[in-house]
A protein has these predicted regions:
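A cross-taxon signal for low-complexity, glycine/charged-rich
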Residues: 5-19, 27-31, 36-45, 49-63, ...
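C-terminal catalytic/acceptor-binding lobe
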Residues: 30, 259-341
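Short, acidic, metal-binding catalytic loop of nucleotide-sugar glycosyltransferases
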Residues: 106-115
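Short beta-strand-to-loop acidic/aromatic patch adjacent to the donor-nucleotide binding site
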Residues: 170-178
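Conserved catalytic core of nucleotide-sugar-dependent glycosyltransferases
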Residues: 182, 188-257
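Active-site-proximal specificity loops/subdomain of glycosyltransferases
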Residues: 124-166
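Cell-envelope/extracellular polymer assembly enzymes that use nucleotide-activated donors
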Residues: 86-88, 117, 271
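A conserved hydrophobic helix/loop-capping motif in glycosyltransferases and polysaccharide synthases
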Residues: 88-96, 111
């Protein structure tokens, strides 16, 4: 979550209750294949998940059978994105949040657009495969989730840094691990992509005051570019609400880990922004952009977490200044795009 975007914190207890019910059903089924199926408790929660990919979790009377539902995937969705590249939704997490990650995953599995895969990138220095929560192992066994263990711990960067290398031909949508996403999050991003296929698409941007202060300009000179459905090089995406990246949006400099660690170790959004400017990739605030997603609320944060580091300690200012000093051509491109050069 970013302090420079309007924040709307809210619990989604109804969704969390349904998620917990579905989790209990799935876990009890894998642990005991003779478990009794309580349709009143679990049926509704599992029904939506069973529809994902055209399969079904349940069959028979008293012995629920969980099928690998992606094996015969036939998404029943009419979408203008039918001819787009394959779509990957990518996220990362860390040990304290893993027990609660299924809340975010359920919100993805109930999206109105179905034709995508989910990849989770974890640092092998933080967690081993045998330490994963059972629900994540179930998702992986069902084919709903690919879990990648990487050696280097690049914090929040992992969800895009490694996804771009593992899935170079994919559209990649990044999300956060402690949010519950609206059912139309992915479809809105893809509809925007269909209009502007070279651009990066976002539901949230950094505000004018922040960028203007770093660029040493009047906020009134930056504010006019923050509008929906209007690509602009100088827009800066905020990742929490979901960001879509087209295939191969960055140059090789994007993978410069030395620069990442030394210039912006805690702010992947700002590194992505500067790298997009260097590669002349515009950003688009999607049409009918969604409000800030609901927090899963029970997720455990790092101490200090990235919000505290970047906002309360003003590290966002320090990191963006460092990036623009290291890449003066990015500053020049931004000012030129604002017709201030």
């Amino acid at each position: 979550m970013d302090c420079h975007a309007l924040q709307s914190k809210a619990r989604n207890d109804k969704n969390l209750d349904s998620n917990n019910n579905a989790q209990k059903c799935l876990e009890s089924t894998f642990e005991n294949t003779h478990a009794q199926y309580d349709s009143k408790r679990c049926g509704g929660a599992l029904q939506a998940l069973g529809q994902f990919g055209g399969g079904s979790y349940l069959s028979g009377n008293d012995r629920p059978q969980i099928a690998p539902i992606l094996s015969n995937r036939s998404p029943k969705t009419e979408s203008p994105q039918a001819k787009t590249p394959p779509v990957l939704v990518s996220l990362t997490s860390f040990p304290a949040r893993l027990p609660y990650l299924h809340h975010t995953l359920y919100s993805l599995l109930t999206q109105d657009y179905k034709d995508f895969h989910i990849a989770l990138f974890l640092s092998s220095s933080e967690v081993r495969p045998d330490e994963l929560p059972l629900i994540l192992k179930i998702f992986a066994r069902l084919g709903l989730l690919s879990i990648h263990f990487v050696e280097e711990n690049l914090r929040a960067y992992k969800k895009l840094f490694y996804a771009l290398q593992a899935y170079p031909e994919h559209i990649i949508i990044t999300i956060d691990d402690d949010q519950i996403y609206a059912p139309n999050t992915i479809s809105l991003l893809l509809e925007s992509y269909a209009r502007f296929p070279r651009a990066i698409h976002t539901n949230w941007t950094y505000d004018a005051a922040f960028l203007a202060e770093i660029l040493d300009i009047d906020p009134a000179q930056y504010l006019p570019i923050i509008k929906e459905n209007a690509p602009h090089l100088a827009l800066a995406s905020v990742g929490v609400s979901g960001v879509l990246y087209p295939p191969s949006p960055f140059s090789q400099e994007f993978f410069n880990t030395h620069a990442i660690v030394s210039l912006a170790p805690y702010s992947d959004d700002l590194w992505f922004f500067v790298m997009s400017v260097l590669n002349d990739v515009p950003k688009v605030l999607v049409k009918n952009a969604l409000e800030h997603p609901k927090e899963s609320s029970i997720a455990q944060d790092e101490s200090p977490n990235l919000w505290e580091i970047n906002c309360e300690q003003n590290r966002n200012y320090d990191q963006l200044r460092a990036l623009l000093e290291a890449y003066p051509q990015a500053r020049a491109k931004i000012l030129e795009s604002l017709e201030l050069a």
